[in-house]
């Protein structure tokens, strides 16, 4: 089984490392415009792998042909979000990068599924889908899984125990919200305080250390695992919607079933209030796409 990563910076390389540690990988390919970085990270990963008696083929470089045969390609390349910058501020800067990456992936690894991480992630997921021409089950985005990890951490610290399900859905950004009707845990919490904490905690991490790294890496690993091991796990995922929840022609976070065919929207009922919030997220994202000519 082969994994591809476009972007060998901190999120891309840490995600590759997390997958290397936890999955049965035959090959990993790292592609980055900074060729030396990609080669160096590949070498470092290979040395780490040998320490746990794993010897997959690990390659790095700037040539997209390295991605050929990847079961799934994780795209983290793009300009990073800076302190004080919203995810949507990044849209104009990263849209051109994603458009170019989409073309190169299709030319070199047309059968691969694509997991988009580059922010603003929902907008970039839609652009990747549109520019690649791939079926919508093969292009999806990571955002709400990370938000949901943050939610679980906040819930636990607020007194929740045995957290069986806790999901954030909607935009990976300011209009995201807790799917309270689907939450399942023991104990009582102050939902308003918890939701407010989750909404702003990423900015706090960025303010203190410059970027979020470990949280995204684990979220990416969880989604990659579900695909390559065909687990069918339901994970909050940015999906291209074509009528689901009364939403069309936009990528937004909803519960999705992940497996060998990629991602498909899960048949899960939301409350009327949650559907309204989801449609609000979708409206905001559609407006951003229109500003970019999509």
Curated annotation (Swiss-Prot):
Subunit-structure text: Homodimer.
Recorded catalytic activity of this chain's protein: (S)-malate + NAD(+) = oxaloacetate + NADH + H(+)
UniProt-annotated location(s): Cytoplasm
EC number in record: 1.1.1.37
Annotated substrate binding sites: 81, 87, 119, 150
UniProt cross-references to Pfam families, sorted A to Z: Ldh_1_C, Ldh_1_N
Keyword Transport: no
InterPro entries xrefs: L-lactate/malate_DH, L-lactate_DH_AS, Lactate/malate_DH_C, Lactate/malate_DH_N, Lactate_DH/Glyco_Ohase_4_C, Malate_DH_type3, NAD(P)-bd_dom_sf
GO aspect biological process, one term: tricarboxylic acid cycle
Keyword field: Cytoplasm, NAD, Oxidoreductase, Tricarboxylic acid cycle
GO cellular component terms, A-Z: cytoplasm
Name this polypeptide is given: Malate dehydrogenase
Function: Catalyzes the reversible oxidation of malate to oxaloacetate. Can also oxidize tartrate.
Family: Belongs to the LDH/MDH superfamily.
List of catalytic residues: 172 (proton acceptor)
Amino acids binding NAD(+): 7-12, 32, 94, 117-119
């Amino acid at each position: 089984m082969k994994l591809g990563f476009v972007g060998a910076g901190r999120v891309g390389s840490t995600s590759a490392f997390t997958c290397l540690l936890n999955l049965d990988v035959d090959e990993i390919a790292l592609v980055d415009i900074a060729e030396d970085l990609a080669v160096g990270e590949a070498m470092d990963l290979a040395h780490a792998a040998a320490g746990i008696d794993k010897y997959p083929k690990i390659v790095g470089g700037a040539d997209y042909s390295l991605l050929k045969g990847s079961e799934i390609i994780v795209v983290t390349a793009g300009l990073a979000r800076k302190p004080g910058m919203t995810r949507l501020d990044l849209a104009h800067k990263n849209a051109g990068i994603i458009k170019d990456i989409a073309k190169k992936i299709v030319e070199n690894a047309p059968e691969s599924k694509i997991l988009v991480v580059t922010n603003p992630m929902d907008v970039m997921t839609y652009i990747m889908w549109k520019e690649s021409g791939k079926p919508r089950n093969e292009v999806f985005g990571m955002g709400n899984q990370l938000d949901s990890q943050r939610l679980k951490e906040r819930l636990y610290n607020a007194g929740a125990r045995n957290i069986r399900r806790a999901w954030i859905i909607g935009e990976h950004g300011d209009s995201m919200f807790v799917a309270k009707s689907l939450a399942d845990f023991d104990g009582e919490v102050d939902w308003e305080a918890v939701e407010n904490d989750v909404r702003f905690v990423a900015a706090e991490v960025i303010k203190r250390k410059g970027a979020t790294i470990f949280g995204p890496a684990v979220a990416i690993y969880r989604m990659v695992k579900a695909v390559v091991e065909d687990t069918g796990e339901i994970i909050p995922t940015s999906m291209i919607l074509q009528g689901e929840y009364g939403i069309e022609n936009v990528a937004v976070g909803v519960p999705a079933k992940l497996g060998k065919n990629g991602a498909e929207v899960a048949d899960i009922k939301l409350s009327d209030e949650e559907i309204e919030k989801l449609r609000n997220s979708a409206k905001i994202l559609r407006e951003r796409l229109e500003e970019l000519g999509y």
